[in-house]
Amino acid sequence: MFYRKSLKIFLCLSFCLVFISLIAQSETIKTPAEESKYTQYSQNEEIARFLSRIDNYSPETTIQIIGKTKETKNYKPKDLYFCIITEEAAGCPSELNREKPTFLLIASQHGNEQSAKEAALLLIRDLAVGELKPLLKRLNFLIIPQANPYGSQFDQRRNEQDLDLNRDHVKLESPEVKAIHRIFRTWMPEVTMDAHEKGESYYKVSVGCVSNPNIHPTLQKFSRDAILAEVEKNLKKKGITFQEYLVTQQIGIDSSAGVRYRPEDQRSEEEMKRFSTTDLNDGRNSLGIYETLSFIQEGASRHDIQTLRERTEWQYFGFRFLAESIAGQGEKINSLVRELRERLIEKAKVYAEQDLVHLRMKYARDEKEPEIVIKNFERSEIPIRGVLKVDKKAGDFLTRDDLVSYPYPSQYKVVEETVKNWFPNVEAIVSVPRPLGYIIPASHQDVVETMLGHDIKIEIFTQDRPLEIEAYQISTVVPAKYDYLPPQRIDVEKKKLQTIVKRGDFYISCAQASANLISCLLEPQSQYGFIRYLKFNLIPEEGDIFPIFRFAEKKELPVIPYKSWKR
């Protein structure tokens, strides 16, 4: 009996010591922003030192360098850091415990959206040596805490190439986005989140889920019903306002394409609200297209240093509550995502007229929900000092004790807005059956290299071969006004042709994880594909045969795997 009591006391003391040790370490290891008392943004060199300390104290953490920024006249290359935090101390995908879901967090693709980065560093600390360490029993974490070191240093949206990283997820011109996709395809997490900041907003945290119709609708429904509902509930307990992420855009303008519109082309006075973009060029749908539970988080922001602490806190709890929700539903998430991924590959092995890929779509109204009521800030004529605890009549004496603090900026009052131009739905307007594969002429090596950047498997013909292919003849084409936009109109006639496929031409089978992405990138009518970027020189003339062919025969081809030794 004495031995049992002694053992219990010993175990309790041991647990307490471990817990106290973790708390002490988390309090000792401060993020760079905490060190400066949130008077400065964390920079790459400071982040490196912070991660070194985390790596030293946390055997569960592995830090890797996954790339470098490009060198410019005023900026030397900076490392891109990647944190793997797992209970098993995994250093590569084969070491992951796949019984748990894996969560990839990408922060601050836009350099001036600083709180996402600061919150990611807090999350790393609390997972590695702090109070969130128990989460590692149920969830694997992959974190890119600063995706745009250049933009962060100069507090600007774009990177050192003057590229908007969150519009580069199709053409992959930046080393930063190439690194993101390499990490995603190497580890294939079930859940991802891309973290940003929006403008000043009543809603401190907004989270959006997948929205492209080529992504299975079950993922969107599960995201909203099972995850976002729980995140909203937990944020509310913290006094943090939440709404699913909404976008305001001028009607007739694609605000998510990455276009730098001329002022005269942005004169539409009518605006609409919708959920986040259907485009595949961002850090959410570009990963969601692999049947991933993919999210975007937008924290409210004035983009000033004075509010950095509170903005970081809002973002942190958004990350934390989403991670806790995933961890609590891990088995269901693993089953859902993996089943959809396997089903997509199996479907792509067989040509079926009813197996459609959606190429063009539009935002649409919902008859059941013709309008939406949201809360907004409206500038107040006089500063708001507080809120009355109890209503008072005009002329009643008022003291400070009669007021509770006003939870919003004093220059704003909260008003309700009824949005009439509300477009919550997405409707496909151009769809085609997915072929078994595509044939790309050797002359379009740039297309092939970009697809390799997406980790799409490509094969090369080892000999000339006569084949029956499906080709598009262009009947009408109206080019876009801007780079990054698809042709305003492109009509095609599909024809079956006999052609000689040349030795050195390329073949891409759709029977792989990127099945839907492949068609979206290569089809001429796609609003998401390579045709929208001038760099690929794919805009045809009327009467032309589009140079990328469809292949729908179940036939053995003289091909071998292709690798680019330039990479």
Describe every region a protein language model picked out.
Residues 2-11:
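Bacterial N-terminal signal peptides that target proteins for export
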Residues 10-21:
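Bacterial N-terminal signal peptides
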Residues 27-38, 105-107, 209, 427-434:
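Acidic/histidine-rich, surface-exposed loop or edge segments in extracytoplasmic proteins
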Residues 44-105:
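Soluble metallo-hydrolase cores and metallopeptidase-like ectodomains found primarily
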Residues 64, 81-83, 102-106, 142-145, ...:
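Structural recognition of the beta-strand scaffold that forms the well-ordered cores
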Residues 96-269, 273-278:
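Active-site/substrate-binding loop(s) of hydrolase catalytic cores
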Residues 252-469:
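Hard-cation-handling environments
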Residues 427, 432, 437-441, 448-453, ...:
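Catalytic centers of hydrolytic enzymes
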